[in-house]
Structure formats: C-alpha cells, structure tokens
Amino acid sequence: MFFAEIKQEEVIVGGFRIGQGFDVHQLVEGRKLVIGGVTIPYEKGLLGHSDADVLLHAICDAVLGAAALGDIGRHFSDTDPRYRNIDSRVLLQNVGNLLAERGYRVVNVDATIIAQAPRMASHIPAMVANIAQDLRMQPGDVNVKAKTAERLGPVGRGEGIEAEAVCLITHMNQTTD
C-alpha cells in the first residue's frame, strides 16, 4: 500500500505526539534567578516579561508544540500586562489545562538547562517535583539535566541561560503499556 492510500486513522497509531521546546534569557543584575520554579541563590537573574524561567518556558513550548497549539508567546504574550512578572509555574499549569481540554496528557518530559553558572545539581530534585506537580505527572516521568557551555558563546561567558525540552503526549484514553 502506498502512503497516499493510508487513511489518517492508520497513520496515527496509538495517538502519540512529540514536542520540542527551547528558550534563552539574558542574565542581569537586580532580578532573582528562577529555574524550574525554584529560586536559586545567585548574583544575577534572568531578564524577561514574566519571571523568565527558561526551563518552564521550554517545557511549555514542547507541550504546546506536541499538541500543535503554537508556542508560549501565542498564549501568554509578553506585551500583555497580565503576565508581567508572573510565576511561570502558573503558565505551565495553564498549558497542562489546555492539553487536558483537548484530551491529551503528558507521558514524559526530558529537559536540559545550559548555564555556565550557577551549579544546578542540588536544585534539580525540586525542579522535577514542580514540573511533575504542574503537569499532573509522576516525578519519575520527568528528567532534568544541567550542562555548562564549556565557556563557549554568550551562555559560556555567563551572559545568559538556555533550556531545551522534549516531551511525549498521548490521548488520555490511550495507554503507554
């Protein structure tokens, strides 16, 4: 059978979808550093309209992308005063609600924070717990890693922090077994 002859229902086996997200923000003085919903002691914070949580923003984009719902800017514009300094956990919870309204749930999240400093390892368990809670998942279905940029580029020079995320979603009536 040629691909053109396959019906749409046959193409979407199991109803699984993959999403990918990315975010980057500049480090500046005078702001607190919030990553994964965790306030991290550091002399600089991330610049942005919201709390500039790069990790949660990347996850929001991954989840929205998997559901073909655009990106974080489409739903939470950085020109809308309602989102000024908003806790990005609220945004992630809202993204989870949008997903559920369309009959999907997140199966797993895998994310990477890229920062020359500060060290993230001791904060990762709290980040994982926040993400799992906000997306109504088990912590064992969330993975967060931290890497340096090996002193290369703007992130390596300590000018900013990046995050990347991928996720798998499925219809709530589907099982992953």
From Swiss-Prot:
Give the GO biological process terms.
isopentenyl diphosphate biosynthetic process, methylerythritol 4-phosphate pathway; terpenoid biosynthetic process
Q: Any idea which positions bind a divalent metal cation?
A: D23, H25, H57
SUPFAM superfamilies hit by this protein: IpsF-like
InterPro entries under this entry? MECDP_synthase, MECDP_synthase_CS, MECDP_synthase_sf
Gene Ontology terms, MF aspect: 2-C-methyl-D-erythritol 2,4-cyclodiphosphate synthase activity; metal ion binding
Q: Where is this site: Transition state stabilizer?
A: H49, T148
Supply the alphabetized keyword list.
Answer: Isoprene biosynthesis, Lyase, Metal-binding
Q: Where does 4-CDP-2-C-methyl-D-erythritol 2-phosphate bind?
A: 23-25, 49-50, 71-73, 76-80, 115-121, 157
- What pathway annotation does it carry? Isoprenoid biosynthesis; isopentenyl diphosphate biosynthesis via DXP pathway; isopentenyl diphosphate from 1-deoxy-D-xylulose 5-phosphate: step 4/6
Q: Which CDD domains match?
A: MECDP_synthase (cd00554)
Q: Tell me its cofactors.
A: a divalent metal cation
Catalysis performed (reactions): 4-CDP-2-C-methyl-D-erythritol 2-phosphate = 2-C-methyl-D-erythritol 2,4-cyclic diphosphate + CMP
**E.C. designation(s):** 4.6.1.12
Cofactor binding comment, as recorded? Binds 1 divalent metal cation per subunit.
**The family this protein is said to belong to:** Belongs to the IspF family.
NCBIfam families given in the database record: ispF
The record's subunit annotation is:
Homotrimer.
Q: What does this protein do?
A: Involved in the biosynthesis of isopentenyl diphosphate (IPP) and dimethylallyl diphosphate (DMAPP), two major building blocks of isoprenoid compounds. Catalyzes the conversion of 4-diphosphocytidyl-2-C-methyl-D-erythritol 2-phosphate (CDP-ME2P) to 2-C-methyl-D-erythritol 2,4-cyclodiphosphate (ME-CPP) with a corresponding release of cytidine 5-monophosphate (CMP).
Q: What is this protein called?
A: 2-C-methyl-D-erythritol 2,4-cyclodiphosphate synthase
Organism in which the protein naturally occurs: Nitrosospira multiformis (strain ATCC 25196 / NCIMB 11849 / C 71)
